[in-house]
Regions:
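Cys-dependent protein tyrosine phosphatase-like superfamily
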Residues: 1-107, 111, 118-199
């Protein structure tokens, strides 16, 4: 790939840091946007759409030796009813995102919104985010491309389907520890309340 001057570097469309070592963006990337990816020192690209990545991204992964995981192709299902994506795709993608050995990792789909937004929303649910905060983040990226069925999918997604990998990232471990501590504190406060004997 021809080396571009630094002033030709562009941030990919729908790009963001999800958590430390996890990024997201559209899978349709130009040569100028590919140069930006160099700064991330990626180990894995997780492709969630059925369509393959852009030619520029495919070439970049090939020349740099970045691991390509095309779950969108292997987990595609034709008859999902109302669901915008399959539960199997989101479950497997979450397990990949939560496996620290895949980091730094970039999550892409053709738009950077549909599958990627749904995956990030389900990750936030695993992180115990408030549902309003999840929807706010989803809509911030989706803009006019957002769909109610994706929000509904996130709300109804069963996080118990996800098998946590043995090498979890520190940010996830710390969030789970804090969540358990808060739950323990709420439980203690609930049972420490005096009982109203005049009831």
């Amino acid at each position: 790939m021809k080396e571009l001057p630094d002033y030709f570097v562009q941030v990919p469309e729908a790009f963001a840091l999800v958590e430390e070592g996890v990024y997201r963006c559209s899978g349709v990337l130009s040569a100028e946007q590919i140069k930006y990816l160099d700064t991330l020192h990626l180990k894995t690209v997780l492709i969630l759409s059925v369509e393959g990545p852009s030619r520029a991204l495919s070439q970049y992964m090939k020349t740099t030796g970045i691991r390509r995981m095309h779950l969108g192709m292997t987990r595609w299902q034709s008859n999902l009813g109302w669901k915008p994506v399959s539960e199997e795709l989101i479950k497997d993608a979450l397990e990949c995102v939560l496996d620290k050995s895949n980091h730094p990792l970039l999550v892409v789909c053709s738009s950077g919104v549909r599958e990627t937004g749904t995956l990030v929303g389900c990750l936030r649910k695993l992180q115990h985010w408030n549902f309003n905060s999840i929807v706010y983040e989803y809509r911030s990226f989706a803009g006019g491309k957002g769909k109610y069925t994706q929000e509904l999918f996130i709300e109804l997604f069963d996080t118990d389907l996800v098998t946590l990998p043995p090498s979890l990232p520190e940010w996830f471990v710390e969030e789970q520890r804090m969540w358990a501590q808060e739950q323990q504190q709420r439980f203690s406060e609930l049972y420490a309340m005096p009982v109203d004997s005049q009831g």
